[in-house]
Amino acid sequence: LPINIKPGQQDFYHVMLSLRLLTIIAGFAFAGSASAASIGIVAPQNGPYELLGQQVRQGAKAAAAKLGLDVVEIHESCEDGSGGAIADGLVAAKVSAAIGFLCTETLQGVLPPLKAAAIPAITLSSRAPILMEDALKYGWPLFRLAPSDRAESDRIAEIILRDWKGHSIGLVDDGTIYSRELVDRIRSALEENGLKPTFTDTMRPNQEQQVALVRRLARTGISHVFVGAERNDVAIIARDAASENLPLTIMGGDAMNAANNPVPLVANVLAVTRPAYDALPSAQAIAGELRGAGIEPEGYILPAYAAAELTAALAEAVQAQSKPGPEILAGGTVFKTVIGDLGFNPSHDLSDNPYRLQRWNGQRFEPADKAERQ
């Protein structure tokens, strides 16, 4: 029984009032089927994030239909103060878990009421560290399928320590806050383990060429460099290194998971990023089913499908163990899903770091065993 809670164009007060009235209706609608497992899908239905919200709904609803989950759809406006009304709808519908939550503004208001109702909130995208710190401090039931920023730097440092010892190493950021913090965490981890980079620099992003940077790397004798920058900037560095005949091993981070334009990435560039979900062995059958139904398994579709699978399994575990859902999730229980085994650590982040070393083959990224040129 889908319940669609969608604000119209009224002022904010009327939106909140109408949502609260609809939650009462939702409660009556679910009164006769309170024992059925249900999933709340909280995602934008209009506005700038409508396409992302559509991906969340398509993936979660496809899994729910297959698993027999009741569905409660709630619009996520991403406005400050909207979380309370969204929580009312989820609590009234007695959902087993709520997934989606693409906006931090929503989570700030939705989490306290969900704590009282023992309803886990599983965000597919929010990485805000302060929000998770508050969640752990106040016991809010927030769990992240999106990897933390620290997961990225931890994996990159691990790979550099494993594969680049004995080489002249460079670390380059693009001056943005995200990039500088990423590179700082990597450098700290390396130095704590006795590996000091030979070269560090801040590049100027969005330039037509990076020959000057490439020549500085060459003069310093750098053979391996990590570049914390957007994919196109890394592609320009790789192109210019090739034109200068510099055999440079280049590795980027999760920002490399982007469109291959305007400058195409040359083969052999490395990236530490999440694998394409539709390429995972565990996803092949479901990806085929989705394509057969006219749904391309891209973006949030497979993560949302996995979150629905997790919700169904969690509902069974709650009944079997007579424990609240958040307690089971925080206890490290692992669930099999379309994107692999998923579980959470005591910090409510994924227990298995999803970042993997990959190599660009000229068409797409593929798994790589070692961070070296081929």
What is each residue range found by the language model?
Residues 4, 8-12, 17, 22-25, ...:
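Extracytosolic ligand-binding ectodomains
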